[in-house]
Amino acid sequence: MKTLLLALVVVAFMCLGSADEVGLGNEQIDRGRRQAIGPPFTRCSKCNRNWSPPFPLGLYTVSHVKSCGGHLSSIGQCGEDWVVKGCAKTCPTAGPGERVKCCYSPRCNKN
């Protein structure tokens, strides 16, 4: 019982934390497609929509933005360092230097 409770606490902490805190910076990146590759990072490019309301499974994209002269600027000026795509019940909180886009459409995570 204690093990199950500990596992639930760890999962809750990971889901509620910043996208950077969840360890999204450790995966391999396909620079051509600007997307995380390899298990388990590609399994959420399309979310399972079989969740009953009020808990839909949404898609999110996390962009780490390069800084220009110590200041974060728009994506167009400095470009995205890399992009992570995944699924979550709630939108993750953007950490320092991150931009998070969340949506609930099956097509929104293809950008």
From Swiss-Prot:
The protein's GO terms of the molecular function aspect are: acetylcholine receptor inhibitor activity; ion channel regulator activity; toxin activity
Species the sequence originates in: Trimorphodon biscutatus
Positions of disulphide bridges = C44-C68, C47-C87, C91-C102, C103-C108
Q: Pfam family example for this protein?
A: Toxin_cobra-type
State the Gene3D superfamilies in the record: CD59
Give the range the annotation lists for the signal sequence. 1-19
For this UniProt record, the keywords arranged alphabetically read as follows: Acetylcholine receptor inhibiting toxin, Disulfide bond, Ion channel impairing toxin, Neurotoxin, Postsynaptic neurotoxin, Pyrrolidone carboxylic acid, Secreted, Signal, Toxin
Maturation-removed propeptide residues: 20-34
Indicate what this protein is called per its UniProt record.
Answer: Toxin 3FTx-Tri3
Record's InterPro entries?
Snake_3FTx (IPR003571), Snake_toxin-like_sf (IPR045860), Snake_toxin_con_site (IPR018354), Toxin_cobra-type (IPR054131)
- Read off the SUPFAM superfamilies from this record: Snake toxin-like
Q: What does the UniProt record say this protein does?
A: Potent postsynaptic neurotoxin. Displays readily reversible competitive antagonism at the nicotinic acetylcholine receptor (nAChR).
Question: According to its UniProt record, in which tissues is this protein expressed?
Answer: Expressed by the venom gland.
Where it mainly occurs, coarsely classed, is secreted
Where is this protein found? Secreted
In the UniProt record, which is one GO cellular component term? extracellular region
UniProt lists the family membership as follows: Belongs to the three-finger toxin family. Ancestral subfamily. Boigatoxin sub-subfamily.
Q: Which residues carry this modification: Pyrrolidone carboxylic acid?
A: Q35
